[in-house]
Amino acid sequence: MARSGFEVQKVTVEALFLREIRTRFGKFRLGYLWAILEPSAHLLILLGILGYVMHRTMPDISFPVFLLNGLIPFFIFSSISKRSIGAIEANQGLFNYRPVKPIDTIIARALLETLIYVAVYILLMLIVWMTGEYFEITNFLQLVLTWSLLIILSCGVGLIFMVVGKTFPEMQKVLPILLKPLYFISCIMFPLHSIPKQYWSYLLWNPLVHVVELSREAVMPGYISEGVSLNYLAMFTLVTLFIGLALYRTREEAMLTS
């Protein structure tokens, strides 16, 4: 009995996922350690720089929990987007096998990055809790929906980056640079309400602001962020994914033959 297209893609993605693990980490455990050290180092540096100021301005909120729920979502978005750029070149030989498509490589990479950072998030939140910092998951459904939309959004941006990077090779070095400003305008280091309201309309165009603030609302009792919307995040995600899929559809054959 012939397999359906979905079953073929499922097997392909599973194989690519295992290949990504071997490529990313190899036989060494240092790769797994680095996945934990990178966000941990960011957390410690920002705690050292901003901890005292934030404790004065937000005395009732755990600053480590506040930071973690900004850093990890940004790392997920940044990592999936950037690792999608070279996905075709990294798997070029595999495309001789008909079932393997470029989009499968992005799905496999997105799954790996998601699993890594979700595990890191849980681990660091446990460490923060054991040090005496308080948090409570008050809206688990909101947290799951927000992060699910974040992953889909990242895949949509990844598709766009992959197509643009393959069509215009010189853009492969430019595209990661475009993500850098998002680190500073996505409310990672500061709450939205600390910005004057007249500037909110500009910041709220950024979907990552909604991801970060909704994540904080879900795990920090009493933290309420005006202006953010799960509906806006869902709409922005769907539009981005549609654009990514449309570009991929029109350029798939050209990318494989170029």
Curated annotation (Swiss-Prot):
Keyword Transmembrane: yes
Transmembrane feature ranges: 31-54, 62-81, 109-132, 144-165, 175-195, 227-247
Family the UniProt entry places it in: Belongs to the ABC-2 integral membrane protein family.
Species this protein is from: Escherichia coli
Protein name (Swiss-Prot/TrEMBL): Polysialic acid transport protein KpsM
One Pfam entry name: ABC2_membrane
Protein purpose: KpsM and KpsT constitute a system for the transport of polysialic acid across the cytoplasmic membrane.
Compartments, record wording: Cell inner membrane
Periplasmic topological segments: 55-61, 133-143, 196-226
Top-level taxonomic group: Bacteria
InterPro entries to which the protein is assigned, alphabetical: ABC2_TM (IPR013525), ABC2_TM_bact-type (IPR047817), ABC_2_transport (IPR000412)
Residue ranges constituting the ABC transmembrane type-2 domain according to the UniProt record: 30-251
Range of residues in the leader sequence: none
GO molecular function, one term: ABC-type transporter activity
